[in-house]
C-alpha cells in the first residue's frame, strides 16, 4: 500500500472517530455502532437485539445471546416490537398482535450536558405473563426529572413464552429466561449508554413484579442488580406458579393440529413447525369466558434435569433454602388490587344488558376455580366446590352476586389474588434472608383507571385498583386518563424513591419525607401507607 493510501485511510478513520465522539446519538458496543434518537428531553435507543431470533429451531429453547456484528450503524430509532400475544385489552374478537421475533432492549437516557452517568431502572412489564409490553409504559415523567436511565426489555409471552410439558423436552419458563438474558446484557453494556452498572434496580408490576421476585430467587441476581421492587405481584401469588401445564401443552398441540401424541419430544417438534400466530391464537380456546383465566400459561417448576433450567423448586422452597440473592426487596399492593379481573364482571352484555356478575349466581362453582386460580391446585371437584362455597360464605354470606355486592367480590379477589401473599412473602424472607424487606400499600383512588376500562362503566366506584400507583411512575395513557395535582406530587416522590434506592449503599428506601421500615428483625409487619396527601408507617401484629 502506498504512503498516500495509508495516510488517506488513517485520515478517514480519524474523521470517523471524531464524528462518533461528537455525536451523542452514536453508541458502540461489541456488536457494533448504534444510532439513537434525540427526543428533546432525552435520547432513546430502541429495539436493540439482545438475543438471537427465538424462531424456527430456537422456538421453545433457552434464548441465545445475540452474536451478529453490524457492518453498518444499527438504526435504534425504530419503535419496539411487541412480543406476539392474545391481548386482553383489544376490544375485538381477534386479539392477536405482535411478532414472535421480539427479544430486544430499549434504553432512555436524560439529556443532561453536565452529567455523564445515571443510575438505572429496568422495567419488567405486567400482563399476566400473557400480554403487554414495555412500550405501553410511558417514561416521560422519569425523563422530565432527569435523574434516571430507563431500560425496557421484551420477553416471550403466553404459550410461546411458557408452554411446558413438565419434562426436559419442553420445560417452559422461556419468558423468564429471556428476562434473565436481558439483565445480563444490560449489566454488560449499559455503561456505554451512560448507565451505572453497579447501580441497577429492577422494578416490575403485576406479572412483572412476580418476575422481579423470581429473578431475585437466583443467588447471582446480586451481580445483576442492586435491588428489586415487586409492585402488586410476587412469586407467591396463586396465579404465578402454575400447575396443570403438561395437560395444557398437549391440549395446545391438539388445537393447532399436532394430533393426539402424548410424547413431549414429538409435541415440541410439531409446535416448532406451526405458525406462531396459530399457537398464540389458541389461547382463546383456554378461556372459560371473557378473558378468564387471565393467565392460561405462566411460570412452572421445571424438572431438575431440564437444560438451562430457571426454576426447579417452588419459590417457597427456594426461599427456605436461603439460596437466593441477598439484596433489598420491596413488595407492595393496592387497597383494591383485585379490581383487575373483578371489574370485568361488571361489563354488560351488549345484547341482553346482563353483566357477568349476575351470571355468577348460577355459575359460581364452575367459574370460581378459574377466576381465583385453584382449578389445578385442588385434586378433586369436591375440594374445589368446598373452597368455592367457603369463599362465597366468607365474603358474601347470603347475598347474591350483583352490582350492589361488587365490593365484596372485589375484596375477595384482592385478598386471594394479591394481598394474602404479601405477609407470606415477608414472613419467609425475614426468616430465611438477611437483606432488607420493605412493603407499601397504596391507598389513593384515581379518577379513571383499570376498573373503569375493564368494566366499561363509570357508575361504579372501584377504589385504588391494580396499577393506580405504578402508572404514576410509568405514565400509561392506555389504562388511565388524566393525573391530579396530588398524583403529580406522588409521581415525583416515587421517582425519587427509585433514584435513592439505586444510588444508596445502605439498602434503605425512602418515599418523600417517609423512611420505609425494614421487616427483617421485626416481629411486626412494617408497611408504609401512601395516601393522597400523606405517607405513614404502620405496624401490624397481624396483617390487616
From Swiss-Prot:
List the cysteine pairs that form cystine.
83-102, 258-270, 514-535
Active site location: 206, 466
Q: What is its EC number?
A: 3.1.1.1
Q: Write the protein's name.
A: Esterase P
**Subunit structure, interactors included:** Monomer.
Protein family membership: Belongs to the type-B carboxylesterase/lipase family.
Main location group:
secreted
Record organism = Drosophila melanogaster
Which Gene Ontology CC terms are recorded?
Answer: extracellular region
What parts of the sequence cross the membrane?
A: none
Compartments (UniProt record): Secreted
This chain is glycosylated at: 75, 114, 262, 456
The protein's gene is named Est-P
One Pfam match: COesterase
| CDD domains registered for this protein in UniProt | Esterase_lipase (cd00312)
Under Gene Ontology molecular function, one entry of this record is: carboxylesterase activity
Which N-terminal stretch is annotated as signal sequence? 1-19
Query: Reaction catalysed?
Result: a carboxylic ester + H2O = an alcohol + a carboxylate + H(+)
The protein's superkingdom reads Eukaryota
Keywords assigned = Disulfide bond, Glycoprotein, Hydrolase, Secreted, Serine esterase, Signal
